[in-house]
Amino acid sequence: MIYFIKAGNKHVKIGYSANPEKRLKELQTGNPLKLKLVTTLLGSYETEKALHLYFARNKREGEWFHLTGELENCLKASIWPKRKNVEPTTIKQFLENGIHFHLSQKAKRSKKVKNLIRQYSVETK
């Protein structure tokens, strides 16, 4: 499961964990800022890496990213279902629009990212 954990008003962690609530508790230990689990969505390790690629220009340290307007709007406006076997339409569109831009620059060698794009691509008619 993909999780988004906010630290204050400036940073967000994009990560992958089978148990995001447990991961939040682990990260909170020793952290002076109050962390908040903003949302989760169904996804794989490859989905996490695709999101990291998309927001690479805002990367701070590790899996922490500067909370830009774009990322904040994505977190506020997107409806990402938490139920099993439900495809999140918003994340499909997000990945389709974002990854194609970065694929030519950062991920040409990655078969996993290419497969992810094929998996989430949506034909519009």
Where are these regions (language model features)?
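Non-catalytic accessory segments flanking enzymatic or RNA/DNA-binding domains
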Residues: 1-125
